[in-house]
């Protein structure tokens, strides 16, 4: 199920998305003023934000921490009508849902972000395990 929120009576409905990210990608988002995702690398044909926070937490904690030493969870809003052009893919269980955005369309996708990209959680290893730092 895709949840949408409404910013105000006159604004368009938005879709809340989350993105697990490592330190390099987060630095590029910060450099954009927290307004845009950086271009994908040549071996990354798809940008895939996820549709629920729990899945983003699992990726940040279980994949990004071992790979990069830190994992972050970001949250952002996108115009819901615009987001419908991209397929939702189930990457595992029923709640493991990703929005698949082709890399060549990421600049346009960024133009439809509403507000700023927010850092909502960070995870770091503690005695061989990961722990939560964030809100």
Language model regions located:
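Conserved NAD+-utilizing ADP-ribose enzyme module
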Residues: 2-48, 54-135
């Amino acid at each position: 199920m895709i949840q949408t929120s409404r910013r105000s009576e006159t604004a368009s409905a938005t879709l809340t998305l989350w993105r697990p990210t490592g330190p390099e990608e987060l630095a590029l988002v910060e450099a954009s003023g927290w307004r845009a995702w950086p271009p994908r690398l040549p071996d990354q044909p798809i940008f895939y934000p996820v549709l629920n926070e729990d899945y983003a937490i699992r990726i940040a904690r279980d994949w990004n921490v071992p790979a990069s030493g830190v994992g972050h969870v970001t949250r952002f809003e996108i115009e819901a009508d615009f987001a419908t052009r991209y397929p939702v893919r189930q990457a595992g269980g029923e709640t493991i849902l990703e929005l698949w955005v082709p890399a060549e369309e990421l600049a346009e996708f960024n133009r439809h972000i509403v507000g700023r990209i927010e850092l909502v959680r960070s995870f770091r290893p503690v005695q061989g395990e990961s722990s939560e730092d964030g809100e």
